[in-house]
From Swiss-Prot:
GO cellular component: cytoplasm
Record protein name field: Phosphate acyltransferase
Pathway the protein contributes to: Lipid metabolism; phospholipid metabolism
Matches recorded under SUPFAM superfamilies: Isocitrate/Isopropylmalate dehydrogenase-like (SSF53659)
Function: Catalyzes the reversible formation of acyl-phosphate (acyl-PO(4)) from acyl-[acyl-carrier-protein] (acyl-ACP). This enzyme utilizes acyl-ACP as fatty acyl donor, but not acyl-CoA.
InterPro entries associated with the record: FA_synthesis, Phospholipid_synth_PlsX-like
Keywords: Cytoplasm, Lipid biosynthesis, Lipid metabolism, Phospholipid biosynthesis, Phospholipid metabolism, Transferase
Length: 350
């Protein structure tokens, strides 16, 4: 049984979306059980409309719901112990749940997750990893918003975390890893990126294959299994890709309905267009995994509908089922066992 804690109050639509989506997950994942945290006055009317959900879930009333516009510091101070977001994360810490899912405020969710779960040994900052549809299938891109700016060591940490996720999710023994840069030549890019590349080459880990630098168009090509960058550029890339997918879908809809001949052509090519639409549907890959913590947390888009939130819940399910935490710890242990230790008395230039 996979136990999944749910922040029912998160997102733009709250229980009206988060709760019905769980029935979709239950149908596809019969060994899932849900620990639901939310305000009784808002969640109960929805639960009463979904009697089948009672068989696979337990509900806990929480007095506070973190708002989407709350600052992380406010969310931590203002009754965090009573909030549905905190309680859902705490269930993972206490061993009552295997993974936490929330569509709530990203900054608050990350702050609470770090405070409650803590980071793994030698990981300074967690990263948010997203699944990215590519020409070759799917890849992982991180960080997409947790860390604005990153030094070389943090980029190396992200590479290790991303490789562990690719190993767990895609069952790839040695995922290929690339550092996002303005060019593939070793002389290009910021010093932090170039130094991270040198460190990854020298580490020569058996758990990954360091490919080198990759450019923005390599993400969609699927040149590597894992693309590593800092959160500012990663978030812009993610939002740009999602917006472009919606833009192309809208162009296709307009083109297919413009003339009678276009509508007739669509009838004959309906299956192909349906496959394209499914491939470009951002709901299918909804969910960012918080990597580097001592527990698993998945962030859904705040605007997700039922199918989108269900995809985030199923992503969390897969992360538990595939042994993400154990594989991450093993990869980190291997790296730090090989990492050079500074001589006693050495002075850092940092």
């Amino acid at each position: 049984m996979i136990r999944i804690s749910i922040d029912a109050m998160g997102g733009d639509h709250g229980p009206e979306v988060t709760l019905p989506s769980l029935l979709r997950v239950a149908e596809r994942r019969p060994d899932a059980r849900f620990l639901i945290f939310g305000r009784e006055d808002e969640a109960r009317p929805v639960l009463d409309r979904l009697p089948a959900l009672a068989d696979v879930s337990d509900f806990t009333h929480c007095e506070v719901a973190v708002r989407m516009d709350d600052k992380p510091s406010q969310a931590l101070r203002n009754g965090r112990w009573k909030s549905s977001m905190w309680k859902a994360i705490e269930a993972v810490k206490d061993g009552e749940a295997d993974v936490c899912i929330s569509a709530g405020n990203t900054g608050a969710l990350m702050a609470m997750s770090k405070f409650c779960l803590r980071t793994m040994a030698d990981i300074e900052r967690p990263a948010i990893a997203a699944i990215w549809p590519t020409i070759r299938g799917e890849s992982i891109v991180l960080d997409v918003g947790a860390t604005i700016g990153a030094d070389a060591q943090q980029l190396v940490d992200f590479a290790i975390l991303g490789a562990a996720m690719a190993n767990a999710l895609f069952d790839i023994e040695r995922p290929t890893v690339g550092l996002l840069n303005v060019g593939v030549e070793e002389i290009k890019g910021q010093e932090e990126v170039k130094e991270a590349g040198r460190m990854l080459r020298e580490a020569a880990l058996e758990t990954m294959q360091y490919h080198g630098f990759v450019e923005g168009d390599d993400i969609g090509k699927g040149t590597v299994d894992v693309v590593v960058t800092e959160g500012f550029s990663g978030n812009i890339a993610l939002k740009t890709a999602e917006g472009t997918a919606r833009q192309i879908a809208e162009y296709l809809r307009a083109a297919m309905s413009r003339t009678l001949m276009a509508r007739i052509g669509y009838i004959f090519a309906r299956d192909a267009f349906q496959r394209l639409r499914e491939k470009m549907d951002v709901r299918r890959t909804n969910g960012g995994v918080f990597l580097g913590l001592k527990g698993i947390v998945v962030k859904s888009h705040g605007a997700a509908d039922e199918e989108g939130f269900a995809a985030a819940v199923e992503l969390g399910y897969e992360m538990v089922k595939s042994g993400l935490l154990d594989k991450t710890r093993a990869t980190l242990d291997l790296y730090h066992a090989r990492r050079p230790v500074a001589p006693a008395g050495a002075v850092s230039n940092a």
